[in-house]
Amino acid sequence: MITKIDKNKVRMKRHARVRSKLAGTTERPRLNVYRSNKHIYAQVIDDVKGVTLAQASTQDKNLGLETTSNVEAAAKVGEAVAKLAVEKGVKAVVFDRGGYLFHGRVKALADAARENGLEF
């Protein structure tokens, strides 16, 4: 009998493997990405203090998005989180793709964050 592979369980294992080697510091916090079917979320986290420094998502009303599950929306989120992080004095981050492939919405968010002042 063939069992169906749970994609999210595989992603969680991949994310745990990556997180064991990756941590955000005070000088270089972690830019974490979570992607659902409808939304994308990004936050800049200082793992030493356990504090979120900046966050943005497609659920934010001030972004004024018509659709929340496409590449353009992800780019707006990347732009917003980068601007908030730069305002807080964060220039360099460690990118945590959350176990997702660096493609599509995740890549669009990362590229927009780079264009708006974050280095990774």
UniProtKB/Swiss-Prot annotation:
Stored Gene3D superfamilies: 3.30.420.100
Name of the protein: Large ribosomal subunit protein uL18
Any one Gene Ontology BP term: translation
UniProt record similarity statement: Belongs to the universal ribosomal protein uL18 family.
SUPFAM superfamilies xref list: Translational machinery components (SSF53137)
Transmembrane region(s): none
GO MF term set: 5S rRNA binding; structural constituent of ribosome
Pfam families: Ribosomal_L18p (PF00861)
Alphabetically ordered keywords of this record: Ribonucleoprotein, Ribosomal protein, RNA-binding, rRNA-binding
Ribonucleoprotein listed as a keyword: yes
